[in-house]
Amino acid sequence: MNIVHKLLFTLIITSIQVNAQNINVNNIEIIRDNFGVPHIYTKTDKELGYGLAWVHSEDDFKTIQEAYLAGNSLLSKHIGLRGAPIDFLSQLIRSDEIIDSLYSTIDKRFLEVVDGYAQGINRYAELNSSEVLVPKLFPITVKKMLKYSFLQLFVSSEGDRAVRAIFENDFESLTFQRRNELGSNLFSFSTNR
């Protein structure tokens, strides 16, 4: 039985290595123009994701990390108690459960690009470890990236304001209930025209 476990372990490690190595960084060419704007040339979309992550990391690795820290309930590990409300919010919206339940519905081609992006950030972090804010965040995974996107969607939909109003017992400030009294998107259909 021990030999079977060793063989299985070897196969799993090999498949992980093959999957992780399907980005050939020699296929990625990044050229910055006179204004510093990166132009990324690659053979695959996944390599493009890697290159994009690399240039984003070169430009502002700190902000990228802070975003993913927020989405993964780790911001307070970087900025202390000021990050606790955001960490709480990202747990309150159950990002883990939502991402896990919907992950299989996401287009595989999109996930490949996001995986390339994650690999690019991870490689940048590996080569620039002094810039890493919270080591526990790494390695960045596709699901960690999606959790940040979920938090971002929640906040851009003003869900954070609703949570704040509920905790402050201030239901009058929930203006989104009354904001669209007249409607914003009206469709009218008639068989007479």
Where are these regions (language model features)?
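Bacterial Sec-dependent N-terminal signal peptides
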Residues: 1-22
